Amino acid sequence: MERSASVGVNDGRFGGNQFYSPSFSSSSSSSSMRHVNYSCGSCGYELNLSSTNRITSTIGSKYGKSMKSGIISFFNIDEGRFSQVDEFQCMPHFSRYSWGLFRHRTKLLCRKCNNYIGNASQEKAPEYALVTQNSDPTSPRIGSVTKYDIRIRSLQPSSAVALL
């Protein structure tokens, strides 16, 4: 399936660029799907962060807001690659789903250069239980899930691997 579009000189959407001609093809889009491994943006230390472990449920309506704030979230990291510093704050905090006077979070630092990478925080488990082939749906759910919020500017891509 091949689709192409051309925009004329007088079309104001692209500033009169007569050479704008995006092409979309199903064969090129499948070969361009890659996952990226990230390393520390300061020293280049491999953090074993992979884009396959990103929380992609926020991609959609909240994706633009997440990118503007410079944060990407992961559900799994290699904790051996980070130094972790527990932080307790005694000040009012408000977010969309919680508020309080005390906040506990864990700062994630690069193990090699101690550059601030992001935060780990506990979140409530979803109201529904995910059932997989090997899981028992009658077993009790875990009360909270750890979410890792990583600053984009603290990372650099170390490699990109094509998915087939």
From Swiss-Prot:
<dbReference type="Pfam" id="PF24046">
    <property type="entry name" value="At4g08330"/>
</dbReference>
<keyword id="KW-0809">Transit peptide</keyword>
<keyword id="KW-0934">Plastid</keyword>
<keyword id="KW-0150">Chloroplast</keyword>
<dbReference type="GO" id="GO:0009507">
    <property type="term" value="C:chloroplast"/>
</dbReference>
<dbReference type="InterPro" id="IPR045282">
    <property type="entry name" value="At4g08330-like"/>
</dbReference>
<protein>
    <recommendedName>
        <fullName>Uncharacterized protein At4g08330, chloroplastic</fullName>
    </recommendedName>
</protein>
<feature type="transit peptide" description="Chloroplast">
    <location>
        <begin position="1"/>
        <end position="60"/>
    </location>
</feature>
